[in-house]
Amino acid sequence: MTVYHFVGIKGTGMSSLAQILHDMKHTVQGSDYEKRFFTQTALEKRSISILPFDKNNVEEGQVIIAGNAFPDTHEEIVAAKELNIPVHRYHHFLGDLMSQYTSVAVTGAHGKTSTTGLLAHVMQGAHPTSYLIGDGTGHGVENSKYFVFEACEYRRHFLSYNPDYAIMTNIDFDHPDYFADINDVFSAFQEMALQVKKGIIACGDDEELQKIQAKVPVIFYGFGEDNDFQARNIQKRTDGTIFDVFVRNTYYDTFKITGYGNHSVLNALAVIALCHYENVDVEAVKHQLTTFEGVKRRFNEKPMGEQVIIDDYAHHPTEINATIEAARQKHPEREIVAVFQPHTFSRTEKFLDEFAESLSKADQVYLCDIFGSARENKGELTIEDLQKRIDGAELITDTTTDVLKKHKNGVLIFMGAGDIQKFEAAYVKEVQVAEK
């Protein structure tokens, strides 16, 4: 019996892939740092073993899948090579796996995870669908027709894939530790476009995506009249959003979604366009759109007394804009409070003014110290450099969250890609202690 061993199983993509293989009746185990990470909950529910890193975890007969964050010098990878066991990097293994299905890659600087989650939810309402979402969620179906997966542009990892379809949500400059500029980002997406086998669904409102060249049809969606799929007559309500879809200027149907903000309409349009081209029944699409509950760390909302707490992964100015816009649509009468933790020194420095501009759209801003990722832990920049660019911004630590209590009827949005959740947890605990 083959055992699949994951080196770095708590990574968001790795965790999802492990879940898929387990659901397909394979034996799966993995290793990682002992620090608890949100992705391990789904692994534990499936009784997938999570071991501390140890070269003795590697044994003959295993299939070794290694996370991209771990170098060839990692003790388990070295042990595998000493035993002449091939080591499959995550993105290469995923590329091989998806070739067995009608595959749909969802990529873009922003909106990948939400769109992948929405597409998976809609498709599985009509056909058996396996999916891999970048929030650590994976689901495998043995007789799948479709394989829907999130494809990341960072370090051009998505060039390991040759999908049947690609949804491209947008092109924006991010990951300044790797990409030189927007032209470098575009070149990566252009190269990816040439690897797609059946068709590309791209946001036509995005100026960069308008320039994409491909060997397959490129179908554009968006708000502009030149798009193949266009959203019109948009009704933004506190219980979701309703809009009409026109296909090449001909009315197609009216859809309701559970999401808020223009970005949610665009995500849904991409899904509607793909389903149209795969002849998925429109009534099934409409129903599934109304039952989507979202993905982890993307506008996850919970009430707490008179306040509302939202947990969101937003870590780029464009994403912060979208999250604040969505909060204002759903809660038009409430004070919007942003609690933001910048992620990586390189990104914070590159987009310092843009971060200040986007955060200033909240009524009050609190800033946590910069979170240095595993890729870089040093920088001369400090959080005060961002604070002085935002009127009234205050600094906050996980021991001073009680200051948030004064926003009696506020919507508190905890945003970031680092460990912002510990600040949220500290505040929730603070409130619970005070209520006793």
UniProtKB/Swiss-Prot annotation:
This is UDP-N-acetylmuramate--L-alanine ligase. NCBIfam families: murC (TIGR01082). Its EC number is 6.3.2.8. InterPro entries: Mur-like_cat_sf (IPR036565), Mur_ligase_C (IPR004101), Mur_ligase_C_dom_sf (IPR036615), Mur_ligase_cen (IPR013221), Mur_ligase_N (IPR000713), MurCDEF_pg_biosynth (IPR050061), UDP-N-AcMur_Ala_ligase_MurC (IPR005758). One of its GO terms (cellular component) is cytoplasm. It holds the Pfam family Mur_ligase_M. It comes from Bacillus cereus (strain ATCC 14579 / DSM 31 / CCUG 7414 / JCM 2152 / NBRC 15305 / NCIMB 9373 / NCTC 2599 / NRRL B-3711). One of its GO terms (biological process) is regulation of cell shape. Keywords: ATP-binding, Cell cycle, Cell division, Cell shape, Cell wall biogenesis/degradation, Cytoplasm, Ligase, Nucleotide-binding, Peptidoglycan synthesis.
